[in-house]
Amino acid sequence: MLPIETHNPLFGKYLYPQAKAFMESQQDVSWSAQEIPVEDDKHDYLSVMSIPQRRLTDTTLQLFVEIEQRVGEVWNEFASWFPHSEIEGACTEIARMEKSVHAFFYQKMSDVLNIDPSTVAENQQTIAVLREKLGLLGQITSNLSANKPLSLFTVAAIEQVLLFSNFAMLKSFKAKGHNLIKKTLTGVDYVIQDRLLSCVGRNAY
């Protein structure tokens, strides 16, 4: 078997079939941001949620936009490291979900509410905890190729430190008697499904 970093010129000769199986599993559960009618949550945002709740949700969703774009870039870089068609396909499929689906889903509510992206960016820099998370994200992804084995754990670190803790915050709007932003949380559930699947796929390597 060719080493994982050695180019396999024979498309269709799958030396890492688990990568192809993962790619197909992700495609089987693929979805789009257009499918989630977050505009149905507009009343909750504008009339039910408190101003602090809404601001926290706005900045969290925009933080997720930044994270998803960075994570997508990470997976595209992984694809270039392992030149086997099945691995490239799997990594590219994850990157597509991150950059073309997840990021645009998180941005969708800001678009519905006509929130100025520059205003959100300013808020992210004035809220210390968000500024620190964005700084950590930049540090983790700044020089992936310097240590490839360590970098394979990069996405897991981003998911655990930056994403899942904030997923819990958003999910709290559907707990303890609350039933707010239902459509938004449906999309969050889809993202979590993709995240768990990518964890399984990454561990297979």
What are these regions (language model features)?
Residues 1-205:
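Non-heme di-metal
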